[in-house]
Amino acid sequence: MNKLITIERHFVEEQKLNPDATGELTDLLYDVAFAAKLVRREVVRAGLVDILGMAGTTNVQGEEVKKLDLFANDKIINAIGQHGRFALMGSEENEGTIIPPKNESGKYVLLFDPLDGSSNIDVNVSVGTIFSIYRLTGDDPSKADINDCLQKGSQQVAAGYVIYGSSVVMVYTTGHGVHGFTYDPTIGEFLLSHENITTPKQGKYYSINEGSRKQFNDSTVNYINYLKEEDAETGRPYSTRYIGSLVADFHRNLLTGGVFVYPATKQHRNGKLRLMYEANPLAFICEQAGGRATNGSERILDIDPSELHQRTPLYIGSEEDVIIAEEFEQGKR
């Protein structure tokens, strides 16, 4: 029988690898895991309670908000904010920063997308939570402000995501590899199921919404055409796999190899995905697993942000596939 390792125990064991660790980051990650359990409880009951459908409001991005978006957002803020470990938080659903009720001793910043892919929830397609953790830039939590949120992705101390699908899986990194945990509802715990995840150097799948093809720039069209061409030497053609839920598409490609593409378009010249709580955390995870993430011209983790809800194009996944995407976007092919 395989040894069962809970997520809490794994956090503690990882902490021992760092002689300077105080245990604070371990507590933060466990808070996130606890919040994920609360969201999971409602996601699996979504068809039985009145949290499907639209909430009748729009978020700061101008997107229609689902009832479950609001529920997940509130649960995460309340579950994590009450412990005083975060001085500041930022969410896709809130225009400005969020000051937790007990932030006097907080030394960290949490940025998150409470329910990525929520447009799929009504039809029972996988959705997820994405999160990113930074240290405060100063020592005084009472002086924390938006600038503490606007750090480069390379400054992240932890990042992760939770997928609510046929099973519930939490994947995270603290910069020392990538680990995945599957939720066991019979004991109410996340158990280690994917240790030291590494992504293939080259994949065989590409994920993109080709329904927007007419909006793509020529460089993106040429890249997609390249992936479809037959060439046994380079393993082409690739197959399309696109769910429409960023975290689910990314997770599949992370495990099996492939590239996820959400490019700049004629309509959205700066891209559409959010840098701070979608692209950055996934880029951190991807690089830790041996992959690559870029906006087409610059490494995602090197982008200097100017606003909380900043958007970016995203090419992320297997290293060789992303390098070729960069070459097309930069006119080298």
UniProtKB/Swiss-Prot annotation:
Record-listed substrate binding positions: D116, G117, S118, S119, N209, Y242, K272
Cofactor note: Binds 2 magnesium ions per subunit.
Documented EC number(s): 3.1.3.11
Gene Ontology cellular component annotations, sorted alphabetically: cytosol
Residues binding Mg(2+) 1, per UniProt: E92, D113, L115
Organism: Chlorobium phaeobacteroides (strain BS1)
Swiss-Prot/TrEMBL keywords: Calvin cycle, Carbohydrate metabolism, Cytoplasm, Hydrolase, Magnesium, Metal-binding
Keyword Electron transport part of the UniProt annotation: no
Protein's name in the database: Fructose-1,6-bisphosphatase class 1
InterPro entries: FBPase_C_dom (IPR044015), FBPase_class-1 (IPR000146), FBPase_N (IPR033391), FBPtase (IPR028343)
Cofactor: Mg(2+)
Encoding gene (name): fbp
Binding site for Mg(2+) 2: D113, D116, E278
Subunit structure: Homotetramer.
GO biological process, one term: fructose 6-phosphate metabolic process
Subcellular location: Cytoplasm
Enzymatic class: hydrolase
Reactions accelerated catalytically: beta-D-fructose 1,6-bisphosphate + H2O = beta-D-fructose 6-phosphate + phosphate
Any one GO MF annotation of this record: magnesium ion binding
Pfam family, one: FBPase_C
HAMAP family, A to Z: FBPase_class1 (MF_01855)
Keyword check for Transferase: no
